Amino acid sequence: MNAQLIESDDEHHWVLLDHRVTQLVIDRSSIRIQTWSLDGSADIRLAAAFTMQLASGATRHVEPADTERLAPCLALVGLGVRSVTVTRNGTLTLAFSDGSSISASPDVRRSSWDVQGGGILEGMAYAGEPGIELW
């Protein structure tokens, strides 16, 4: 199996094996990261500000609507996705094979992110909605 879910009361931690970022889609108000393996896929949409920790250790605050500043995200294409972690209070963290990561907190005004899995990741379905605990 290419994925394992580790559940606790406060978080769901999905460990992914052999998953790579196959597409990065940019539109006017969000970015979409698509990951794929032979057994499953995940579609992750980020529609509010998030923090990107680069492999070099540098940190970038990224606003998806500010397309001129999305350049660091381009380096994600082709990287392995090591894990997807969602907390009960609505924080999403993605960890990549080069040591970089993305962390998206809930936004008080709008849906800030969503995750949808397919194949063996069918149970991976979360949405970072304002003011809502996820489980």
PLM feature segments, named:
Residues M1-W135:
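Surface-exposed, interaction-prone regions used to assemble/regulate multi-protein complexes
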